[in-house]
Each structure stands twice: as structure tokens, then as C-alpha cells.
Amino acid sequence: MLKISRESEINLINVLIDNDIISGKDLPNIKKVSTEKNKSQIDAVFELKLCDEDKILDVLVKEQSLEVVDLSKIQITDDVKSVLPSNYINMNFVAPFKVDGKDLHIAISDSSKLGLMRNLKAITKKNIELHAAKVSQISEFIQKLQSESGDVTTEAIRKENKDKVRTKT
């Protein structure tokens, strides 16, 4: 079962509607399955066979020409563990997976995340490189990341960044 924030779930449902993958007529059925089986609406979409992960990935890749990343093969490094606050990662359903100098590589599942670019750059002070990944891989990666790093707060990131600056001089 996917672990996805309500806000991200709504955004993804809207992307599916906007791309004519599902219709407004499907929503009552999606909500019914979601409620009855205590699953996310995205899981319900998959269960009802209205769409699959590959279709969602294809839409993102075609719309945005993003490179696809297989998060199941990515090792989580220490610099990735503390690059973004846990609550931000959960709320926005983004998976930071690689820090390469001044570049931060982040996997997204749908185009609703494109509006986060400026915010991500402001938080991390890094150039943001977006990649496409399957919804389930992002969900699993976020869970793995947070089980390894614990609850990363904005305050902890600021402190770590301050310490990094001090050690350089």
C-alpha cells in the first residue's frame, strides 16, 4: 500500500483527470474503494485498473522530458538523509536521492511537483535536477530514507549547514 500525503494524492488524481486517464465519473467509485479498503485513492485507481504506475510515469516523461530513475537501485547516502526536512518530503511526496556538488537530484511522480522547484532551491541552496520515478518506488524510498535518518527538522538542517560552513574556514 502506498504511503502518500492527502495533498499529493489529490494532486495526482487531478493530473490523471487533466490527462484524461480517469474521469470525474470514476471519482465516486475510487472514493468508495479507498474508504472500504482503507487504502489511498491512488491504490484504489490501481485496484480498479483505471491506470497503472507505468501510465503515470509515461505521462510525466512525455510532458516534461524527464529522465527516469529506478529508486529501488539507489543507495541512500548521508548527505541525502539531511538535505530536506522529513515533513516536507512527506507532504510533497518527493524523493531526494543524490547530492552531486551544488546539484540535488529529486525524483517526482507527477507534474504537480514542478511548482516546488523554487521552494526546493531556497530550502537546500542547491540547483534542483528533477527525475521521474514510479509512485510505489517514491513511497518505498521515502519510508526507507526516513527509517534510516529519523525525523529531520529544518532546525537540524540549519545547524548542520552552519557547522559545514564553520569547518571550511
Feature map (PLM): residue ranges:
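N-terminal, intrinsically disordered, highly charged
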Residues: 1-169
